[in-house]
Every structure is written in structure tokens, then in C-alpha cells.
Amino acid sequence: MQELRFVLIVVGALAIAALLFHGLWSSKKEGKAKFGNKPLGKLDVDQGDKDSVEQERSFAPATEDDFEIIRKDRKEPDFGMENTFDSKFEADPLLGGVAEEKHSVKEEAEEIPSFVAMKNDVEDVAIQPSEVEEPMQEVVEEEIMPSAFDAPKQEMEMVEEVAPAVVEQPEEPKPEPEMQVIVLNVHCAGEEPFIGTELFDSMQQNGLIYGEMHIFHRHVDLSGNGKVLFSVANMMHPGTLEHGDPAEFSTKGISFFMTLPCYGEAEQNFNLMLRTAQQIADDMGGNVLDDKRNLMTPDRLAAYRRQIVEFNAANA
């Protein structure tokens, strides 16, 4: 921007100087042509009037008005008629002083262009700012216009940057389903309770392993590794199957339970738990009961399976 402004100022100054030089040259040329067409008789003015004019010029004080007088006399012809003029004054010895005054006036006239040029230069310098300001305004307009056209592009870029942030909204985590528990019981058939030695042996043969919380668990792996599919606790208080000597442990029954959701297929886990409970009941001579300690019926088994299906559908 600064370089362009400097170039425009230099070009404007050169153009103005060229116009001034051409104007001075044209005015000088027109003056010569204008006076050259006049007859010689018109240039012979009254000698007395000429002397009085020249004396007034030689003795007049140098004021600012002299510049006006000099500018008017500057257009007088300075061609071959000056020789005739000078010869007339030089021929008359009485007018020798007047001839000298004539030379002094001519010297002043020759110095006129410098004063005129200086004054014109001052006027030109004063004019330059106003003339140079026009191209500067054009440059500013040229710079503003592209920015106005670029504004929509910038807005579009901002919209494109903001759009992905609006579209990409994090999905809200689904709430965890409410846990449900399915319970089966194996109870002794009479008044005689289960003895720990026989009970624990039957449980171990059906893949149950004593572990955490002092109860038995059925893992995915029969070696006791992996996720727990279901567990077995004491049906009586305090609920644990903790024992020091299995022969001294006894209980009226045990409870099988599994949770929903669970690892793997819930329906398969329920079927495995049901078979294990039935096998232990057969080994111990007991009965399989539901969660309310009623004898298991086909309708109650269907209700258990329906509960599992509805839970899976609600949390699919």
C-alpha cells in the first residue's frame, strides 16, 4: 500500500511538472508568434513615454506588485526588433544613460522566468496534495471492494467449520436396565434336613464350586474360571453355606438364583440352572420350589421364561 502510494505521488508530480513546462513553452511560443505578426510601425512608441516608463521601473521600490508588472512585460517580443530599438538609443549620445537603463531593464526581464517559475512551483506544490488524493481514494475503493466480495466466503467458511460441531452430538448413554432376579429352591421332602456331606458332594458333581460370599457358584468354565452364570445359597438364615466340617452342617433347603441381565444367553442359563436344581433334588430326595416356595408347575416355568423374553425385548 505504501509503495503504491509513493508511486502514484511521483507519477502525479511528474505529470504536473510536464504540464507546467508545456504551458510555459506554449505561452512563450504564442507570444512570439503574436508580436511577430505586427508591423514595425506599431512598435515605435513615443520616446518620452518610453523614457518615463523605464525610469519608473528603474526607481520603483521592489514590492510584491513588481511581480505583476514583470509578468505583463514578460510577453513582450524579444526578437530582431530589439536590435533596431537598441541602435536608436545608441545612435543618440544624449540617450546613453537611457540605453544603460534599457539594459538593466532587459536583465530584469531575463530574470523574470525564474521568479515566475518559483511562484508556479509553490502553487504546484500546494496543489499536489489535492490532485494526488484522487488516486489514493481510488486505491482505497479497490481494496474495500474485494473485501466486501470476500465477506460471504469468510461467512461460508465459518458456517462450514461450525456445522460439523452441531451435527456431531454425543449420543446419550442408555440407562442401565433394572436388575431382576430369578429364584428356584430345593427343599427337603420331610422333616429330616440335608446333611452337608451328601449335599456338598452332589453340588460339586453338578459343576458348583464353593467360592466368594461363602456360597457355591456355577461358572462358564467348570474349573471355576470365567463369568458366573448362577449361584446357590442357604435357604435358611444366615444364607451362607460356610462350614468347617461338612458332616456337622445341615439345612432344610438351598436357593438357586440368577440375575438379569447376565453373561451369555439368559434363557440358556435358566435352563442350566433348572436342570442342576432338579438333579440335586433327585440326589437328596427333595422337591423343586418356585420363588414363593411353592411346588414348581409347568405354568410357573412358562412364567419364568416369559419374564426372560420380556426383559430381553425391553433392553434390546
Swiss-Prot record:
Task: Give an example GO cellular component term for this record.
Answer: cell division site
Matching SMART domains, A to Z?
Answer: ZipA_C
Residues making up the signal peptide according to the UniProt record: none
Q: Which Pfam families match?
A: ZipA_C (PF04354)
Q: InterPro entries of this UniProt entry? A: Cell_div_ZipA, ZipA_FtsZ-bd_C, ZipA_FtsZ-bd_C_sf
Query: What subcellular locations does the record give?
Result: Cell inner membrane
Q: Specify whether Transmembrane helix is a keyword of the entry.
A: yes
Q: Where along the sequence do coiled-coil regions lie?
A: none
Q: Which GO terms describe its biological process?
A: division septum assembly; FtsZ-dependent cytokinesis
Gene3D superfamilies for the chain: ZipA, C-terminal FtsZ-binding domain (3.30.1400.10)
From the UniProt entry, list the residue stretches annotated as the region Disordered.
36-65
> Is the keyword Transferase assigned to this protein?
no
Instruction: List the Cytoplasmic topological domains.
Output: 27-316
Question: Which intervals lie on the Periplasmic side per UniProt?
Answer: 1-5
* Residues annotated as transmembrane: 6-26
Q: What does this protein do?
A: Essential cell division protein that stabilizes the FtsZ protofilaments by cross-linking them and that serves as a cytoplasmic membrane anchor for the Z ring. Also required for the recruitment to the septal ring of downstream cell division proteins.
Q: Which family does it belong to?
A: Belongs to the ZipA family.
The record describes its quaternary structure and partners as: Interacts with FtsZ via their C-terminal domains.
- Record HAMAP family: ZipA (MF_00509)
Q: NCBIfam families of this UniProt entry?
A: septum_zipA
Return the protein name.
Cell division protein ZipA
